[in-house]
Amino acid sequence: YAEAVAAVMASRRAEGVATGRAVGALVRELVRDVRSTIAGDAPRVGYWDLLIAHDDRTGHPTNLSPSLPPSLPPIYRRLFGEVPLGLSDLYQPRPQLGAPCRKVCETWLNRQRTALLVVGDRGAGKRTLVNRVRAELHGELPVHWLSLGPHLASEARVCAALCEATGAPYAGSFSEFSRLVPLLGGRRVLILENAEQLFVRTPDGLRRMQDFLDLVRATDDALLWVVLIAAPAATLLETCLKLPMYFGQVVRVPAETGTFIETMIRSRHRVSGFGLRFKARRAPALQRLRRPFTRADMLPDPGEEWFVDLERMCAGNLRQALDYWLLSARLDV
C-alpha cells in the first residue's frame, strides 16, 4: 500500500512539474506579447522563414557548419542583385519615372541643351532606372558611366576619369575640362553616379560642387549629363546652390509601395524556377486568449502577412527589401 501511494504521489509530482513548466512557458509568452504590444515592436528580420524548394534532396549543406541551413545557390542570389540588361523579365516598369527621363534624352537628341538629375535614397532604384534609359539609347551615342567613391572624389581624380572616359587630353580642374570638351568631336552621354561624393560641408566642398555644376551648364550641348545623387545631399545643395536650376529635369525616385515590392520579388523568384512556400507562424498567446475560437481573422495568409511586414521593415526601399528576402530565405531540404 505504501509503495502504491508513493507511486501515485510521484506521478502527481511529475504531472505538477510538467504543468508548471507549460504554465510558466505560457506566462512568459504572454509577458513578451504584452511588452511588445506596449512598446509597439515590429517583427525582426527572419521572424518567418521563406522555404525555397530545390531538387537536391541529398541533405548536404553548402555551409561550412552542418548545423546551419544550406545557403542559397549563387545563381539564385544573383537574381536579387542589380537587374541585368538582358533579363527584362526582372524589371518592374516605373512609367512615372521613366517618361521624364526619356523626354530629357529626346530633347537633347534634338539639339536642345538639357541635363538630367536623378535624386533618391540609396537603394531606391536610381541606377536601375537609368540603366533602362541607357539601354534605349544604346547604339545611338557613346555612353560613359562613372561611379564616384572615396577613391574617386577629388576634383583632379574626377577630371582624370572624365578625360580617360571621353578621350580628352588631361585636365586638372573642371574649368579646364570644360574648355577641352569642344575638341572631343561628337556628342556623348556621361552618367555620373554617387555625385554626393563631390560634396563636403566645407567652403572648399561647396566651391568644388559649384565648379562641377558650372561644368554641367557649360558643356550640356555636347554632353548629356545624367547625374545620380543621394537625397540628403541633394536637399542641402538645393538650399545652398539652387541645384535644380542646372538641370532641365529633376526626377525624384520615391519609396515604393508594398504591392510593387511584392511583384518585384515574386517576378525574380519566378525566373529561378524554384518553388516557394511561406512558413506559417503560430498566433501570439495574447491573440489566442482574446479570440480562442476565431483563428481565421488572426492568421491571414502567411505570404500576404510576410509582405505586409516586409513593407514596414524596409520602408519602401527596394535594395533593403531584396536584402531582407535573401536574409530570410532558407532552402527546404
Annotate each PLM feature.
Residues 113, 120, 197-205, 209-241, ...:
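Sensor-1/coupling segment of RecA-like P-loop NTPase cores
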Residues 89-105:
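N-terminal pre-P-loop "Q-motif" helix
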Residues 1-87:
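Extended, charged/polar low-complexity intrinsically disordered regions
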Residues 152-172:
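Conserved NTP-binding/hydrolysis module of P-loop NTPases
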Residues 251-303, 312-313:
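Conserved small helical "lid"/interfacial subdomain of P-loop NTPases
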